[in-house]
Curated annotation (Swiss-Prot):
It is found in: Cell membrane. Belongs to the complex I 49 kDa subunit family. It is a peripheral membrane protein. Its main location: membrane. It comes from Bacillus thuringiensis subsp. konkukian (strain 97-27). InterPro entries: NADH_Q_OxRdtase_suD, NDH1_su_D/H, NiFe-Hase_large. This is NADH-quinone oxidoreductase subunit D. Keywords: Cell membrane, Membrane, NAD, Quinone, Translocase, Transport.
Amino acid sequence: MIRTEEMLLNVGPQHPSTHGVFRLVIKIDGEIIKEATPVIGYLHRGTEKIAESLQYTQIIPYTDRMDYLSAMTNNYVICHAVETMMGLEIPERAEYLRVLAMELGRIASHLVWWGTNLLDIGAVSPFLYAFREREMIINLLNELCGARLTFNYMRVGGVKWDAPDGWIEKVEEFVPYMREQLAGYHDLVSGNEIFLNRVKGVGIYSAEEAISYSLSGANLRCTGVNWDLRKDEPYSIYDRFDFHIPVGSVGDAWDRYVCRMQEIEESLKIVEQAVQQFPKEGAVLAKVPKIIKAPKGEAFVRIESPRGEIGCYIASDGKKEPYRLKFRRPSFYNLQILPKLLKGENIANLITILGGVDIVLGEVDG
């Protein structure tokens, strides 16, 4: 008589394929996952509570450490929320610098996802190529703000520093280079039969399920939902650029891959246009008081980060610190669908599905 029993398996919290301190407790019967339970909180630092005792400018460095792979968009969302409350008009040159910084950051973030996701499923070379190009972007951002990862570049009213001499020209030269490398990525990976067998038909969910789980970003668009805040609710100067939003149709790991790869191409279009339209001169910071006090009231803003919709809610009582601060962190919401995706899957697909969701634990835990 054959007898089977379920086995409890811990993935993490230090497993290399979780890309952070994330633990996944799974029950398996043979090689089939019966249940998956994410365990989070290992990187929780209480950012929102700490912010209640900080001035608005002091909060910006804390946002760098949420989604640390896309710190510029985190910088922007807190500044945008305060600027909305204060009714500030941002200098045009500062807006272009912000867009350039955010879109370069988006490309760098997707490169990390591409390289590490493929490394997890056994392809080593793409990881090396991805980090080669990412290093070029990091060097550009380092020249702009003096930091490689946690930038603290944006300010309420604009940005901290203007671009150094020759920086715009370097960004302009990077665009055609990156396009050429991107074509090489597709030649290397996108048509590879082994890779396609690992991602096609794996981790499928519908548009209705994506919406019910509050998914956003590529995790939503892979199901065919055409929704991107840069297009649908334009902020900053995104309405000045010509670009389209990549969408999928099936909602599997392959569609998520295609959406993110095409997003790199669209970000390059935005960067190219921003360089062409970049103002020759002008201020990079609006006239704001040294001690910023948001007027009494509430504001909620949301923008499109590489992982989806990141939002910032501020309740102010008129003081120099927020009365309440709340972030909508897309990685936290995107993670919620993971147990549903893993149930009934072969354990070999676990890392493929987890990598396709593309979470950052600093953002999940907050």
